């Protein structure tokens, strides 16, 4: 929004031209989201406490989690508000890239909000019925997939980039819609499964978003894109603003979510952030890279799939409890140890993912 005002004011004072630079607006976007989260966080936590919107803890979970009962949840609203305010202020609202991610955040955030509302306000422990949740996620993802396929202007927008291989970018055709669907829905649910310990999901989300900010910047510049053998995507640079807003809002939320947490993000946050990462990966054509950099999310999801599959087929469990972070808790690891070690793994995987841009 302010980019248009700055463009107008440039004719009176050339110094306003600095707002035309994506990097400058990205820094302001990060700072805006961070400062808003730090400012509004205490007020929101107090409000959630007054409304008695507290976390529901499963009785069959680790005993150390019983003390978390009643901790305010639905803090994802804080994250989403910070992102939206920052992007609307500093982003180019004429960019379809920006609106795609905002739509994903809003739609999946709404699904998560309904789920949280049923759990913590209406005291329905099951929340939104799984099939309805999946149906709503599917509708939102398909809408985005069809829109991106129909509006693609260049061949690079529907190619699949394969890490480690130079110029291996097969044209997907209609299969692009399928890939977009599974990337967004899968990423959304993967982050949701990871969000089981204080700060466990938000920090890897911040790391992956920061990495995608760099990738979006490189993809939006023809020289960098050609040098790194990745698709050149005109206008993709505006995604840098979105990514840095996620980083800022995420770090601001982590201030209150770090162990012992004062607030949890709830499904309204985890489903929305996961879907946003999936959408950004799709927009910069780096779905496989998301699997690498978001390896912690993948590990958590696979542990659940293996646990359920093993129990149904063999009647035996592989892990003491799934997702896998609970397995380590039941082995006796203190919660902070599990969290920080998963953060370290996430950092390593993000750096590995970035390294693939050059290792081709």
UniProtKB/Swiss-Prot annotation:
GO terms for molecular function: metal ion binding; phospho-N-acetylmuramoyl-pentapeptide-transferase activity; UDP-N-acetylmuramoyl-L-alanyl-D-glutamyl-meso-2,6-diaminopimelyl-D-alanyl-D-alanine:undecaprenyl-phosphate transferase activity. Its EC number is 2.7.8.13. Pathway: Cell wall biogenesis; peptidoglycan biosynthesis. It catalyses: UDP-N-acetyl-alpha-D-muramoyl-L-alanyl-gamma-D-glutamyl-meso-2,6-diaminopimeloyl-D-alanyl-D-alanine + di-trans,octa-cis-undecaprenyl phosphate = di-trans,octa-cis-undecaprenyl diphospho-N-acetyl-alpha-D-muramoyl-L-alanyl-D-glutamyl-meso-2,6-diaminopimeloyl-D-alanyl-D-alanine + UMP. It is an enzyme of class 2 (transferase). PROSITE patterns: MRAY_1, MRAY_2. It holds the Pfam family Glycos_transf_4. It is a multi-pass membrane protein. Keywords: Cell cycle, Cell division, Cell inner membrane, Cell membrane, Cell shape, Cell wall biogenesis/degradation, Magnesium, Membrane, Metal-binding, Peptidoglycan synthesis, Transferase, Transmembrane, Transmembrane helix. GO terms for biological process: cell division; cell wall organization; peptidoglycan biosynthetic process; regulation of cell shape. GO terms for cellular component: plasma membrane. Its cofactor is Mg(2+). It is found in: Cell inner membrane. Its main location: membrane. The chain crosses the membrane at residues 21-41, 74-94, 97-117, 135-155, 168-188, 199-219, 236-256, 263-283, 288-308, 338-358. PANTHER family: PHOSPHO-N-ACETYLMURAMOYL-PENTAPEPTIDE-TRANSFERASE, PHOSPHO-N-ACETYLMURAMOYL-PENTAPEPTIDE-TRANSFERASE HOMOLOG. Catalyzes the initial step of the lipid cycle reactions in the biosynthesis of the cell wall peptidoglycan: transfers peptidoglycan precursor phospho-MurNAc-pentapeptide from UDP-MurNAc-pentapeptide onto the lipid carrier undecaprenyl phosphate, yielding undecaprenyl-pyrophosphoryl-MurNAc-pentapeptide, known as lipid I. Belongs to the glycosyltransferase 4 family. MraY subfamily. This is Phospho-N-acetylmuramoyl-pentapeptide-transferase. It comes from Shewanella piezotolerans (strain WP3 / JCM 13877).
């Amino acid at each position: 929004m302010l980019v248009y005002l700055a463009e107008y004011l440039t004719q009176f004072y050339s110094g306003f031209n600095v707002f035309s630079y994506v990097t400058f607006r990205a820094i302001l976007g990060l700072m805006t989201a961070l400062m808003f989260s730090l400012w509004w966080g205490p007020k929101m936590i107090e409000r959630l406490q007054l409304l008695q919107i507290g976390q529901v803890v499963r009785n069959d979970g680790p005993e150390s989690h019983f003390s978390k009962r009643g901790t305010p949840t639905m803090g994802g609203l804080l994250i989403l508000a910070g992102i939206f305010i920052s992007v609307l202020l500093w982003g180019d609202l004429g960019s379809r890239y920006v609106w795609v991610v905002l739509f994903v955040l809003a739609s999946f955030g709404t699904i998560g909000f309904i789920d949280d509302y049923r759990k913590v306000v209406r005291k329905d422990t099951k929340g939104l019925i799984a099939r309805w949740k999946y149906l709503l996620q599917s509708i939102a993802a398909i809408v985005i997939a069809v829109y991106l396929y129909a509006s693609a202007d260049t061949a690079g927008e529907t190619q699949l980039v394969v890490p480690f291989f130079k110029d291996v970018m097969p044209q997907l055709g209609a299969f692009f819609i399928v890939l977009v669907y599974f990337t967004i829905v899968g990423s959304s649910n993967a982050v949701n499964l990871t969000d089981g310990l204080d700060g466990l999901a938000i920090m890897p989300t911040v790391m992956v978003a920061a990495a995608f900010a760099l990738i979006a910047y490189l993809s939006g510049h023809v020289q960098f894109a050609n040098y790194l053998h990745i698709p050149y995507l005109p206008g993709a640079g505006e995604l840098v603003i979105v990514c840095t807003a996620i980083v800022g809002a995420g770090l601001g939320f982590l201030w209150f979510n770090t162990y012992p947490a004062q607030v949890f993000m709830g499904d309204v946050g985890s489903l929305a952030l996961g879907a946003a990462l999936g959408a950004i990966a799709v927009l910069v054509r780096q779905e496989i890279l998301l699997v690498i950099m978001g390896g912690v999310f993948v590990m958590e999801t696979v542990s659940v799939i293996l646990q359920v599959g093993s129990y149904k087929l063999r009647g035996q469990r592989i892990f003491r409890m799934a997702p896998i972070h609970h397995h380590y808790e039941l082995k006796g690891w203190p919660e902070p140890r599990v969290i920080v070690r998963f953060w370290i793994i996430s950092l390593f995987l993000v750096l590995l993912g970035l390294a693939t841009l050059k290792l081709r």
